[in-house]
Amino acid sequence: APKPEQPAPAPKPEQPAPAPKPEQPAPAPKPEQPAPAPKPEQPAKPEKPAEEPTQPEKPATPKTGWKQENGMWYFYNTDGSMAIGWLQNNGSWYYLNANGAMATGWVKDGDTWYYLEASGAMKASQWFKVSDKWYYVNSNGAMATGWLQYNGSWYYLNANGDMATGWLQYNGSWYYLNANGDMATGWAKVNGSWYYLNANGAMATGWAKVNGSWYYLNANGSMATGWVKDGDTWYYLEASGAMKASQWFKVSDKWYYVNGLGALAVNTTVDGYKVNANGEWV
């Protein structure tokens, strides 16, 4: 009998696909390390007190003496207060304005002017020059005005204190101050003319006798030369200004005679010579 066919082998079940492996979970994030707590700063070491550490700090010493603040100088008294007004320090005088700042240059206190140097020290008993003008301050520092006698000479300081030069009219008289400011006396030549200043400095006009000779000064003070009429009388002044007297002399080819007083002889006879109304020998 036929052999029964071998049944086909039962199919092997497929191997089931391997179960998917679960993915590895992402590692849990590590907690951030907390920032390290800041270390407390080391406290600054206390400076060693000058004295024993147990003593409290001494209060600040008050300012005394000169202090420069914002470019200005101030002076503080020993009690710490700021000085104002006049201050004597190390032999010099200083002036502190109302705000305490040290003054320099001209300062008016009351009716008087004073001058403080760049250092602040007051000038005294001296001549000094400011902006090409000369000034004088006395021993108290006060600016001089009017007449000033200095080292035997006289000077005149105008109302604003500057030294006068040239002609000065004062109380009705004229005076001449030389270029260096000293008052002229005696003969002075100014702009080509001669003038005579009396011993007190006043300019002479009219007749003046100097060293035994007579001179005539015009109304403007200038010395006359040549013919001069004073009143009704004529006189003759030489080129030097000296008046001729008791002599015959010749001018422009004419002869004239003047007597002992210098007066020109007219309409008369002198030494047998006749002179006419003009004084000319005829």
What role is predicted for each listed range?
Residues 1-282:
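Extracellular adhesion/carbohydrate-binding repeat motifs centered on closely spaced tryptophans
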